[in-house]
């Protein structure tokens, strides 16, 4: 390894065998550095050592080839250009500075919520871009025919319910905007899309409208899986019992490039949060190991009691949503119409507001670690939210599509044509009201609850106001809100193609509202958790919401009769029927035969066998990789033990090789570091070997400390130093 030799006095006497062993180690290290293709700038050495390594790789007097001289400046230019692109991308990244500030002040756990919100915004923008490119722009370019008169259907309906056209309308513009009736004849809803008959030469708007939601859901599915897979390799390699040493955090956490006081303050908070999380995790592990059998039995009973109570709360909430939706759709009297319009969204929002609060209190009784507590709260909140949305969809299906009910209008037209002549618009309006109501609640709680609470706590003093304090920023509740809004957006892709645009605007505003609430109106949670322990669950919850949205959409596209009065699929028994028609019109006969074969049982059975084989191979490879990872862990432990043995041998060897106390090579003049060639904490830097007279570097250029100068210690820079 690199050794520092004095150029002012000769070396101390050494034993021949030890000198030969050290020279052999030195020659091996030099050969390794010369043969390595690692760039010099990436090596963990001081600048003087890097210059020496460059001289070893490119000695003077040796001529390089023309290709090397031509390729080197271009390689350096490409590297500089790549770094400039990365800096530019970080500079123009969405909310990079805000995310850095939030992560430093409140920890990576709360920062993960805002990062997740940004990911949802990008998903919505991608969905909107695909819809605009494949549906809206071709529709405007092709100029579909004008809307003709509505079909006059003679419906056999009872006299009690009012048809949709006779439902009282309120001409207040604000109310029409909130309910979505102001946009019934716009491209926001399904009913405004029209197209002529299909032909073999024109672009099919119907096929694009049908496939764009499916493609968007598929792309969102791939993006969520990619984000979920990013954290898996680290968890697999490190394992669940891995803990970063506190010494590594203490000596390597500070960024010495910081020259601004605000950035230094944020960095101090970030390091403090990391150390607090490490100490709290260690304390919880010690307490869990010291529990007796009686304490474990009491804890198990607490788990059972809490989970039974949570299940009862979920069942009651689902029942309330079902009956609220059913009552709202079955009663459309003029006196109650204004209230019943927002009865289902109101009940769902009330459940989603009270549910996380109760779940947080109940799960805290179980005394879980902060990361596990957040994940369990999130799981129960998601079960509540997805079950609520599922029950809401089922109730709408019962009312609109007569699922599980027998009605005369449903037998004739496939849906409840008496009450809903354009049922796609009605479903779209319900989903639109859910999105609007969710955002209005976010604004109301931020400025009508959190802000007055903070002002009252700061204005008055007393035990009550001390107990009340500022609002705690609950990550599970906030994640639940944006996941619910995103699930509703995915459910409405077929009924409201422009709903992702509306949700993108709401997510953009939600980021700044939540940031203001966090920085001004909220207090930091005393139970800190890591982002890596919850980010995976955030995306898992989002994936469950995607599956919940995909199941009703697949049923509607494949098996539900379209409205006779509006939309693109008025003449089709189901929207999917346009696909066989276009296949027969636009594809040649061999392609049609190939598609028939791909959709037949003769192809499905071999495909199933092939997928089974591939799945078996993947599982076998995964198990082999797990065994290899275990072997690498053991090998790493063995290497660490071997290093410690070498350190012990070196500590026994140093007294034998130490010169006289007055010599400049005495042990007192050297720093006590067992990291030769590597920048250890507290050491002045790597040590460089003695060079030939032509390539010799002075000891002053290596930055070798004198005996009177103590080794530098780690400290935070003061404000005057910055």
From Swiss-Prot:
Residues found modified as Phosphoserine: 6, 18, 658, 663, 673, 698
Presence of keyword Endoplasmic reticulum: yes
UniProt entry keywords in alphabetical sequence: Endoplasmic reticulum, Glycoprotein, Golgi apparatus, Membrane, Nucleus, Phosphoprotein, Transmembrane, Transmembrane helix
Biased amino acid composition, Pro residues: 678-687
InterPro entries reported in the protein's UniProt record: TMC, TMC_dom
Compositionally biased spans, kind Low complexity: 689-712
Domain of life (superkingdom): Eukaryota
Segments in the Cytoplasmic topological domain: 1-118, 226-307, 397-430, 514-536, 620-722
Region (Disordered): 1-21, 658-722
Transmembrane intervals: 119-139, 205-225, 308-328, 376-396, 431-451, 493-513, 537-557, 599-619
The keyword Glycoprotein is annotated on this UniProt entry: yes
GO cellular-component term (any): Golgi membrane
Region (TMC domain): 366-534
Topology within the bilayer: Multi-pass membrane protein
Lumenal topology ranges: 140-204, 329-375, 452-492, 558-598
Distribution of this protein across tissues and organs: Expressed in thymus, lung, prostate, placenta, testis and spleen. Expressed in lymphocytes and peripheral lymphocytes.
UniProt-annotated location(s): Endoplasmic reticulum membrane; Golgi apparatus membrane; Nucleus membrane
Residue positions the entry lists as glycosylated: 184, 375, 571
Alphabetical GO biological process terms: intracellular zinc ion homeostasis; negative regulation of canonical NF-kappaB signal transduction; negative regulation of protein-containing complex assembly; positive regulation of apoptotic process; protein stabilization; regulation of extrinsic apoptotic signaling pathway via death domain receptors; regulation of tumor necrosis factor-mediated signaling pathway
Disruption-associated phenotype: Knockout mice breed and grow normally. No major defect in T cell subset numbers or function. Decrease in CIB1 protein level in thymocytes and lymph node cells.
Domain notes: The TMC domain mediates the interaction with SLC30A1/ZNT1.
Subunit structure: Interacts with TMC6. Interacts and forms a complex with TMC6 and CIB1; the interaction stabilizes each component of the complex. Interacts and forms a complex with TMC6 and SLC30A1/ZNT1; the interaction regulates zinc transport into the ER. Interacts with TRADD; the interaction competes with TRADD/RIPK1/TRAF2/cIAPs complex I formation and facilites complex II formation.
Function: Acts as a regulatory protein involved in the regulation of numerous cellular processes. Together with its homolog TMC6/EVER1, forms a complex with calcium-binding protein CIB1 in lymphocytes and keratynocytes where TMC6 and TMC8 stabilize CIB1 levels and reciprocally. Together with TMC6, also forms a complex with and activates zinc transporter ZNT1 at the ER membrane of keratynocytes, thereby facilitating zinc uptake into the ER. Also inhibits receptor-mediated calcium release from ER stores and calcium activated and volume regulated chloride channels.
Homology family: Belongs to the TMC family.
Name listed for the protein in its UniProt record: Transmembrane channel-like protein 8
Organism: Mus musculus (Mouse)
